[in-house]
Protein backbone atom coordinates (compact mmCIF):
# COMPACT_ATOMS: atom_id res chain seq x y z
CA UNK A 1 0.00 0.00 0.00
CA UNK A 2 1.47 3.30 -1.09
CA UNK A 3 0.25 6.43 0.65
CA UNK A 4 -0.94 8.72 -2.16
CA UNK A 5 -0.37 11.92 -0.18
CA UNK A 6 3.38 11.18 -0.24
CA UNK A 7 3.90 9.33 -3.55
CA UNK A 8 6.31 6.44 -3.22
CA UNK A 9 6.54 6.63 0.58
CA UNK A 10 5.15 3.56 2.30
CA UNK A 11 3.26 3.95 5.54
CA UNK A 12 3.52 7.67 6.23
CA UNK A 13 0.06 7.53 7.78
CA UNK A 14 0.60 4.30 9.71
CA UNK A 15 0.73 5.98 13.13
CA UNK A 16 -1.02 9.21 12.18
CA UNK A 17 -4.20 8.24 10.32
CA UNK A 18 -6.21 11.01 8.66
CA UNK A 19 -3.69 13.62 9.79
CA UNK A 20 -2.34 16.25 7.42
CA UNK A 21 1.43 15.89 7.44
CA UNK A 22 3.89 18.36 6.01
CA UNK A 23 7.49 19.50 6.18
CA UNK A 24 6.00 22.81 7.35
CA UNK A 25 5.61 21.38 10.84
CA UNK A 26 7.17 23.70 13.40
CA UNK A 27 4.09 24.70 15.35
CA UNK A 28 2.98 24.73 18.98
CA UNK A 29 -0.39 23.98 20.53
CA UNK A 30 -1.28 25.93 23.68
CA UNK A 31 -4.27 25.11 25.90
CA UNK A 32 -5.24 27.63 28.57
CA UNK A 33 -7.85 27.06 31.26
CA UNK A 34 -10.67 29.57 31.62
CA UNK A 35 -10.72 31.99 33.17
CA UNK A 36 -7.20 32.87 32.09
CA UNK A 37 -4.85 32.04 34.97
CA UNK A 38 -2.16 34.18 36.52
CA UNK A 39 1.25 32.59 37.01
CA UNK A 40 0.03 29.05 36.21
CA UNK A 41 2.27 26.01 36.02
CA UNK A 42 3.15 25.04 32.46
CA UNK A 43 3.28 21.44 31.23
CA UNK A 44 5.07 20.81 27.93
CA UNK A 45 4.26 17.54 26.12
CA UNK A 46 6.70 15.94 23.65
CA UNK A 47 5.19 13.13 21.57
CA UNK A 48 6.96 9.88 20.81
CA UNK A 49 7.32 7.80 17.69
CA UNK A 50 10.88 6.44 17.68
CA UNK A 51 12.06 9.80 16.30
CA UNK A 52 10.65 8.51 12.99
CA UNK A 53 6.97 9.46 13.03
CA UNK A 54 4.41 11.42 15.00
CA UNK A 55 2.63 14.70 15.42
CA UNK A 56 1.33 16.72 18.34
CA UNK A 57 -2.03 17.23 16.64
CA UNK A 58 -3.49 13.75 17.24
CA UNK A 59 -6.75 13.80 19.17
CA UNK A 60 -5.25 11.60 21.87
CA UNK A 61 -2.80 14.43 22.68
CA UNK A 62 -5.49 17.10 23.11
CA UNK A 63 -4.45 19.07 26.20
CA UNK A 64 -7.74 20.87 26.87
CA UNK A 65 -8.90 18.40 29.51
CA UNK A 66 -5.63 18.48 31.45
CA UNK A 67 -5.60 22.28 31.28
CA UNK A 68 -9.19 22.57 32.48
CA UNK A 69 -9.10 19.97 35.27
CA UNK A 70 -5.64 20.78 36.67
CA UNK A 71 -5.69 24.56 35.95
CA UNK A 72 -2.35 24.37 34.14
CA UNK A 73 -1.25 25.61 30.76
CA UNK A 74 -0.49 22.72 28.42
CA UNK A 75 1.84 23.15 25.46
CA UNK A 76 2.69 20.57 22.82
CA UNK A 77 5.13 20.97 19.99
CA UNK A 78 5.86 19.51 16.62
CA UNK A 79 9.40 18.78 15.58
CA UNK A 80 11.05 17.27 12.53
CA UNK A 81 11.30 13.48 12.60
CA UNK A 82 12.88 10.81 10.41
CA UNK A 83 15.61 11.89 8.02
CA UNK A 84 14.36 15.50 8.11
CA UNK A 85 15.03 15.66 11.84
CA UNK A 86 17.76 13.17 12.61
CA UNK A 87 19.85 12.46 9.51
CA UNK A 88 23.52 13.10 10.26
CA UNK A 89 26.15 13.45 7.57
CA UNK A 90 29.49 13.62 9.42
CA UNK A 91 31.70 16.38 8.10
CA UNK A 92 28.82 18.20 6.42
CA UNK A 93 27.91 21.38 8.32
CA UNK A 94 24.57 21.54 6.48
CA UNK A 95 23.43 18.20 7.96
CA UNK A 96 24.86 18.00 11.49
CA UNK A 97 22.10 15.68 12.70
CA UNK A 98 19.61 15.90 15.56
CA UNK A 99 17.92 19.04 14.22
CA UNK A 100 14.67 17.61 15.58
CA UNK A 101 16.13 18.19 19.05
CA UNK A 102 17.05 21.75 18.05
CA UNK A 103 13.41 22.24 16.99
CA UNK A 104 12.38 21.15 20.48
CA UNK A 105 14.90 23.55 22.06
CA UNK A 106 13.48 26.42 20.02
CA UNK A 107 9.98 25.54 21.22
CA UNK A 108 11.20 25.47 24.84
CA UNK A 109 12.87 28.86 24.37
CA UNK A 110 9.66 30.25 22.87
CA UNK A 111 7.70 29.07 25.90
CA UNK A 112 10.19 30.73 28.25
CA UNK A 113 9.92 34.05 26.40
CA UNK A 114 6.17 34.08 25.73
CA UNK A 115 4.21 31.93 28.18
CA UNK A 116 3.62 34.79 30.63
CA UNK A 117 1.39 36.42 27.99
CA UNK A 118 -0.85 33.35 28.28
CA UNK A 119 -0.91 33.50 32.08
CA UNK A 120 1.88 30.97 32.57
CA UNK A 121 4.85 31.00 34.91
CA UNK A 122 8.11 30.51 32.95
CA UNK A 123 9.80 29.42 36.20
CA UNK A 124 7.32 26.57 36.75
CA UNK A 125 7.62 24.37 33.67
CA UNK A 126 7.32 20.58 33.58
CA UNK A 127 8.44 18.59 30.54
CA UNK A 128 6.79 15.24 29.89
CA UNK A 129 6.50 12.79 27.05
CA UNK A 130 6.27 9.18 26.00
CA UNK A 131 8.71 6.97 24.13
CA UNK A 132 10.98 9.22 22.03
CA UNK A 133 9.29 12.18 23.73
CA UNK A 134 10.39 10.92 27.14
CA UNK A 135 13.91 10.35 25.78
CA UNK A 136 13.83 13.93 24.47
CA UNK A 137 12.91 15.20 27.93
CA UNK A 138 15.99 13.49 29.39
CA UNK A 139 18.19 14.98 26.67
CA UNK A 140 17.00 18.51 27.51
CA UNK A 141 17.73 18.21 31.24
Curated annotation (Swiss-Prot):
Present in most cells except erythrocytes. Its EC number is 3.1.1.8. It is an enzyme of class 3 (hydrolase). One of its GO terms (molecular function) is cholinesterase activity. The modification Phosphoserine is found at residue 131. It is found in: Secreted. Keywords: Disulfide bond, Glycoprotein, Hydrolase, Phosphoprotein, Secreted, Serine esterase. Transmembrane segments: none annotated. Glycans are attached at residue 39. The active site is at residue 131. One of its GO terms (cellular component) is extracellular space. It catalyses: an acylcholine + H2O = a carboxylate + choline + H(+). It holds the Pfam family COesterase. Substrate binds at residues 49-50. Homotetramer; disulfide-linked. Dimer of dimers. Esterase with broad substrate specificity. Contributes to the inactivation of the neurotransmitter acetylcholine. Can degrade neurotoxic organophosphate esters. This is Cholinesterase. It comes from Ovis aries (Sheep). The gene is BCHE.
